Amino acid sequence: MVSMKEFIGRWKLVHSENFEEYLKEIGVGLLIRKAASLTSPTLEIKLDGDTWHFNQYSTFKNNKLAFKIREKFVEIAPDERSYNTLVTFENGKFISHQDKIKENHHSSVFTTWLENGKLLQTYQSGSVICRREFVKE
């Protein structure tokens, strides 16, 4: 079983599938979708006490997320949409449930896990699934 602390570190995106399609599914505009799809962000994961930090850095936009496991919070996404979010850790995976606050927004589920020394993520909204692969820096 993977320890939560094994996620800590800096991870560089090396492969992405369906990211632009995922952004389209959740209603992100064309120009932002194109710009975001061309970046290769670094994901920095830290633990401070019982607060996790998933900070994403890129030439396009930086996004910082701080949360406690199993504690609901309001998340402001990079496109300024607000979500009620709950993150759990189950079977070696961080699972983030992003529930829409406004009716015209879309809910998503993000899953993050480690496999063969890589950090893998899926983003799912509706029937669209994005897959991302990171390697440790």
UniProtKB/Swiss-Prot annotation:
Gene: lbp-8
The keyword Transport appears for this protein: yes
Protein name: Fatty acid-binding protein homolog 8
BP GO annotations: fatty acid transport; lipid transport; long-chain fatty acid transport
Subcellular location: Lysosome; Nucleus
PROSITE patterns, A to Z: FABP
UniProt-listed CDD domains: FABP (cd00742)
Gene3D superfamilies xrefs: 2.40.128.20
GO cellular component: cytosol; lysosome; nucleus
Organism per entry: Caenorhabditis elegans
MF annotations from Gene Ontology: fatty acid binding; lipid binding; long-chain fatty acid binding; long-chain fatty acid transmembrane transporter activity; oleic acid binding
